[in-house]
Structures are given as C-alpha cells and as structure tokens.
C-alpha cells in the first residue's frame, strides 16, 4: 500500500493504533465546546444525553414559553391537551440525528458506548456502539455507516456500476475512508489498481483503530490511499485512465458539497475511459427530489453515454432509502439495468475469498431501477 498525504498537517498514521495527540483522548474530545467523557456540555446545556436548553427542556418535559409543562400543551383558549407518553420521549443515552436536509424528523439510536468523539479539520467525527446496528459512524451529526445495517448501501454502490461493465481493472473511490467500499471492491479478481481519496485523515485513523479488518485492506498492493481533496484529485487525473469511479460521499453540505456540482462531474467524465462508469450517492426520493433533479440535470449535460437513477433500502438512513446516480461516458454501450458482470451470492466465494454477499444479487440490481410513479415522472421529465 502507498499512502500519500496532501493535507496541510501531513499526518494520518499514528503509532500503535493511538489517536494523534491533537486533542483526541480516550475516545473523547475536549474542544472549546466542552465535549468531555462522552458528554456534551455546550452553551445550550446538553449534558448526559439530556437537553436542558434555555427554552426549558428538562428530564423529558418541556417548559416553553408557550406553556408546555409536565406533558401538557396549554392553548390560548385555556384548554389543555395531554401529551401521551411524553415522559419517555426524551431519554439519556440516545443519539438523535437532526439535519436541515430532513427537517421535521429525526432518527434515534440507543448508545451502548461512545467509542470516539472528535473534531477534524473538516467536520465533527463520532463513533459509538449502538444497541441495534453495532458500530455507528457519524459526520457532523449525520449517520454515515453502521456496521450491521450499512451493507445494502455499500454493496449497491460498488456492484451496481462494476456489475455493469466487463472486466473492471482501474477504479477510483472518492471518500470511503473507513474501508467498507474497498472491502466490497476486492471481490473482483480483474481489478489491478484502486485509488482511494479521502479528505479527512481522522476518518482513516478511526478505521485503523476501530475497524482493523477493513483498514488492513489499505495494505493491499493494488491499493493507493491518498489523503486529500477528491475533487482536486479527479481534476488532475490522467484523461481516460479509470474504468469506474465510485463517489462514496456524505451529503451535499460541508466538505462534500463540490462532489455534487457540474465541474466535478466534468472532471469525472474526463478521467473515465470511453464507456467508463461512475456511481455516486444521490440522496432520498422522499426528501430530496429538488437535489436529485439538479444532479440529473448536471449529469445529462456531461455524460453522453447513459444516465440512470437507482435506489435501495438502508434502515439507518433518512426515510430508510438512498439513491444512486449511475452514468457512463460515450463509447461502448452500458446497460446499467441488466448486469453483464454480476457478482452474485452463488459465485462470490468462487471469485474471491470474502464472505458471501448479504444484500446484492442480480434481481435486486435490476429492481433498483424501478421507481415509484411520482419519482419516475419527475426524474424522466
């Protein structure tokens, strides 16, 4: 394995599996915002998983100025509405995912143990052990991957594109610094070269510390790990070099924002060979049709082969689903909806030494492109 650092601090690998001494200690983060011992003591008063804001949330009750007290809502007309079960609605020891990308709703998981909490140069990074899904990685408060529930996302983002072309040899992964995507990609015996570009060295450090079975694949002789900006890397890549590019990014905010815009897709198309393919994470049809339509518009202007949208189910993502954009450059025809190189459960152990697939098969591959009527009409318009 070759490791290339393009970050300004130049530091990624730490000795003996220890987190670098930049403030991360014993799985805690002692920032100016007051994270200590797995608790958060911000100015707004979050402590021990309980929210004690200035608006008066305390011990599972709400005492707002609008009259929420002891599980009731007092209206201006003097009537009170009983809030059933309000005493159990706020509990310590739970992680709740809030974001402007999915307003008005949240997803919660019970935290068994906080494993790591820190702030990198780019984002807040947290890893905890959940009661249901094993280890859970979050970036800026949004769930990125769960050890026992994220395999549908990973298997599909790899096998939808690679199953659609014969004999992939040179592949680029943007993001994916934990290593789940690389793990799936190594099923293909034809692959000769894999470049991984991860912008956040702390994500890689977390992988080495808490997912050693994944980080071990960084040492595969076919793999080059680059620590730097994925958009800049693609822009500088040799034209026509890659057979496939997989963009395993977070949501289109923060450091991943550039990975959803037209200049990035233009650089991707240039870096792909004729008939090369790209697959990128493309949000949820239930919440983000406005984002999806913009991504599709950008891709149709750039990619002269085919442009397709697929989706699948992931239990720990907002609305329980996630989408993918699959595009090809002009050249040999690519029919994403009918895999020519499927790596099904029956053949997995023949083609690699890895455990059988848990989610992907040829039927699910084909079904991923069947969209609900409302989504189909908007995407095809």
Swiss-Prot record:
Catalytically driven reaction(s): putrescine + S-adenosyl-L-methionine = N-methylputrescine + S-adenosyl-L-homocysteine + H(+)
Name under which the protein is recorded: Putrescine N-methyltransferase 3
Function field: Involved in the biosynthesis of pyridine alkaloid natural products, leading mainly to the production of anabasine, anatabine, nicotine and nornicotine, effective deterrents against herbivores with antiparasitic and pesticide properties (neurotoxins); nornicotine serves as the precursor in the synthesis of the carcinogen compound N'-nitrosonornicotine (NNN). Methyltransferase that mediates the conversion of putrescine to N-methylputrescine. Promotes leaves ripening.
GO BP, sorted A to Z: alkaloid metabolic process; methylation; nicotine biosynthetic process; putrescine biosynthetic process; response to jasmonic acid; spermidine biosynthetic process
InterPro entries: PABS, PABS_CS, Putrescine_N-MeTfrase, SAM-dependent_MTases_sf, Spermi_synthase, Spermidine_synt_N, Spermidine_synt_N_sf
Encoding gene, per UniProt annotation: PMT3
Active-site residues, record numbering mapped to chain: 248
PROSITE patterns named in the record: PABS_1, PABS_2, SAM_MT_PUTRESCINE
HAMAP family named in the record: Spermidine_synth (MF_00198)
Domain PABS: 92-329
Organism, scientific name: Nicotiana tabacum
Tissue: Predominantly expressed in roots.
